Amino acid sequence: MRKDGKGNGGSRVELQKEIVRVCKALNSEGVKYVVVGGCAVILHGYYRTTHDIDLLVDSSVENISRLKKAFQELFKSDEISEIRDADIDQYAVVRFAPESEEIVIDMIGKIGTIDFKTAIQDIEEIEVEGIKIPVCGLSTLIETKKGIRPKDKEDLLFLIGKKEYLGKN
């Protein structure tokens, strides 16, 4: 983990490699998740930086167990075991930043009114380096980005423009 608390957001190439690495591990364990936040915006084609990987996850005990197993194997770290099954539902964001890595992963149970069950109704599977990544669809991603932060406003302009260009409702 970097001492400044920022993840691997400095380089788009490095971040893409991290996203692929994380999603490959999650897919191999059958974890139910959707990429949201800045990484989802990037995967939809907007060039921006982000310092973390945001994952909207199914908060069932079985799924959290699979997620923890995937991260233990990927990062060779027991730090993930500190996260309790109920944490995803209890906290707005559960942050995992393995000591040995320059990566920050935010696990989220709900963004506003959007939970995993809602998000999977509108996902786009984007393939990167042969790995299928479930990414939050445009309409749902727009809903999750209706915040007041300047970067959310920039993301919204891009997402709404892309949605209009593609003619999606």
Tell what function each PLM region has.
Residues 1-169:
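Compositionally biased terminal segments of proteins
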